Amino acid sequence: MAYAVEIIGDARMKDLLKGCSAINYHTHKADINGICVELNCQNKDFIDMWSDNFYHMSDHVRPHARIYCVEDDSELHAEYHIESFTMFLFNFDYYGWIKSVALGLAGNILERSHGIYSVHGAAIDIDGRGVTLIAPSKTGKTTQSWGLLRMDNSHLISDDWYFVQFGNGRPRITGSEKNCYIDADIGDVWEEYKPLVTGVKFDNKGRGIGNVRWIRGEGAVIPKSSVSVIILLKRDKEDPAIERRLGVDEALEYLESHDFCNPHQLVRGERDLALRREFFRRYLSECAVFMVNTVCTAEESQERIRKLIKEVI
């Protein structure tokens, strides 16, 4: 994780809240799969991005989780009061971390209290069947998921984070964001996305909130699906295998060895990790699972991924 998270007690939280009460914050509430997460921040640009990024929660709803952004002389870090799901972010200058913390907070509540689990991955509905790409950073997850969105009868659930619930039939998934936090170069591989960036205000990291509906139409984003196919990605030039089907144990071992492909797990106690381990074991067991090694060009990797998907759906 790029930032350290310290778990704090009641006394420290009260001290921090007292200090925050003297700050004139911009405030906005997000609806993240039914969880109300409130952002308190002095940076108006972050508030505007947050408002574009997430579905809105009524101001009359009290927050289930809160984020306070603090600027002081300390190092970049976060302090987390688990009992109240309150996070203090010190000197965060990157919106991507703030929104991931919000998703992590919502995930904590849903995981602990509702049996709903988080996946840091992309999910696309193709002809009514859910496909997810889960991968470590820099292996092409975003590129390949946006490539799949170019298919006929495809709809975006999420390009970054979604929630999973079990029941009758295949695992059910729900998206987390209204609009996507995209890179300025999103159109470099898939040219049809070049017009998407024209109306986006990009931050100091070259990223901004983009609305894929501008390109794919109003129905391009849907809230839910059920998953049939899990694609794991890696980029390993030493491995001659480009694509193959995986068993549950091998797939779970890969995910565990890469921190479940989620650097924004805010709590990592043994109980929490055991819950996630058992979740992923069940999730993998109820879907067809493949590994794709993205050492080829983006276009060739896309062809291979589509071929694997068509074997199942």
Q: PLM features: what roles do these ranges have?
A:
Residues M1-I98, Q302-I313:
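Long, basic/Gly/Ser/Thr-rich N-terminal segments
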Residues A2-T27, H120-P136, R150-I313:
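Glycine-rich, often acidic-flanked micro-motifs
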Residues P63-A65, S100, K224-S228:
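Non-catalytic, well-ordered alpha-helical scaffold segments
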Residues R66-S74, A78, E83, Y117, ...:
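A short, charged
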Residues L76-H77, E111-R112, V119-A122, A135:
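Catalytic micro-motifs at enzyme active sites that drive phosphoryl/nucleotidyl and oxygen chemistry
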Residues W97-S118:
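N-terminal pre-Walker A segment at the start of P-loop NTPase domains
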Residues K141:
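Conserved lysine of the Walker
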Residues Q144-S145:
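Post-Walker A alpha-helix
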